[in-house]
Curated annotation (Swiss-Prot):
Name the record gives this protein: G-protein coupled receptor 157
Protein task: Orphan receptor that promotes neuronal differentiation of radial glial progenitors (RGPs). The activity of this receptor is mediated by a G(q)-protein that activates a phosphatidylinositol-calcium second messenger.
One Pfam family this sequence matches: 7tm_2
Side of membrane Extracellular, spans: 1-15, 70-87, 141-166, 251-259
The keyword tRNA-binding belongs to this UniProt entry's keyword annotation: no
Annotated membrane topology: Multi-pass membrane protein
Cytoplasmic side: 37-48, 109-119, 188-227, 283-330
Superkingdom, taxonomy of origin: Eukaryota
UniProt gene name: Gpr157
Chief site of localization: membrane
Species in which this protein is naturally found: Rattus norvegicus (Rat)
GO MF annotations, alphabetized: G protein-coupled receptor activity
Length: 330
């Protein structure tokens, strides 16, 4: 890796934009947690996994906010603490994002049910919290976390650029898992989407009348189908700028300090919670309707299904039904 360039200066407007992104992400993650607490009947297994992703994103947004606000000029105790928290939360967010995709694949395509599902969720907890924690503790103990001149961050602390094996630790504390997610997320969601499309085609051969009604009204599964494409697409669009700056830093390119790249990197790393909120709250009719009713103080009408709509699953059964496999966003 070439000798690090002079520190990237974080302009006031850049800092303001990234701080706003942190706040919106924290609010979005908090809203996801609140909807989970308010409405027990929406607590499918997939949305419970989404809850843990939201907690990781909330911690990530808070730690990034402090780092951007401080705009560290060197390694200090709070720089190391902030770097450790953001490293743990960010890496955990990668693991939970992939865990949700893997869960949907196994549940919908492989029809995994019963005790196997419970064991799978426990495995997700062990890996998605345990691996990031172990990596972060090792990085702190070996004094790898510190000031990074904002070349691979946007004001916050991450891996100390003075460390000789900094590239290895950058990979271990985020970039390796980030690049794996670029591959796994599109692959898993495309497999799920392909399976659902095949199921719909087979069903339409035996239920042409039902299918016609769905086409007239707009099939509830069509929104889930779109989100199966949007979930990995949004993840990549947010995270790719971080990867671009990482590669530019490895090459010693001065382009790494370009204001546009800096801002895109800052938003991409901090807005994951906000993006999840848009996808799984604001773009989810069942949650959005209840939320608007609550905010506007309107009494929520008794659950009523329009003609042709599927019956809402009972508590805990959203992911268990084989007829209408649910994305945690439908």
């Amino acid at each position: 890796m070439p000798t690090p360039a002079p520190p990237t200066e974080l302009l006031p407007w850049e800092r303001a934009v990234v701080l706003l992104s942190c706040v919106l992400s924290a609010l979005g993650s908090g809203l996801l947690v609140a909807t989970h607490a308010l409405w027990p009947d929406l607590r499918s297994r997939a949305r419970r996994l989404l809850l843990f992703l939201s907690l990781a994103d909330l911690l990530s947004a808070a730690s990034y906010f402090y780092g951007v606000l401080q705009d560290f000029a060197g390694t200090s105790w709070d720089c190391v603490l902030q770097g450790a928290l953001s490293t743990f939360a960010n890496t955990s967010s990668f693991f939970w994002t992939v865990a949700i995709a893997l869960y949907l694949y196994l549940n919908i395509v492989r029809a995994t049910r019963g005790p196997c599902t419970d064991h799978l969720v426990w495995a997700f907890h062990l890996i998605s919290w345990g691996v990031p924690l172990a990596i972060t503790v090792a990085a702190v103990c070996l004094k790898k976390i510190g000031y990074d001149a904002s070349d691979v961050s946007v004001g916050w602390c991450w891996i100390n650029l003075e460390a000789e094996d900094r590239v290895l630790w950058m990979l271990l504390t985020g970039k390796l898992w980030e690049m794996l997610a670029y591959i796994l997320l599109p692959l898993l969601y495309l497999l799920v989407r392909k399976h659902i499309n095949r199921a719909h085609q087979a069903l339409s051969e035996y239920r042409p009348i039902w299918e016609g009604r769905q086409l007239q009204r707009g099939s509830p599964t069509s929104m889930a189908d779109k989100k199966l494409i949007l979930i990995p697409f949004i993840f990549i669009c947010l995270r790719v700028w971080s990867t671009v700056r990482f590669v530019l830093t490895l090459c010693g390119s001065p382009v790494v300090q370009a204001p546009v790249l800096v801002v895109l990197h800052g938003i991409g790393n901090t807005f994951q919670g906000g993006a999840n909120c848009i996808m799984f709250v604001l773009c989810t009719r069942a949650v959005r309707t209840r939320l608007f009713s609550l905010c506007c103080c309107y009494p929520r009408p008794p659950t009523q299904n329009p003609p042709g709509a599927s019956i809402p699953p009972k508590m805990g059964e959203s992911q268990e039904s084989r007829r209408t496999p649910e994305v945690p966003s439908t």
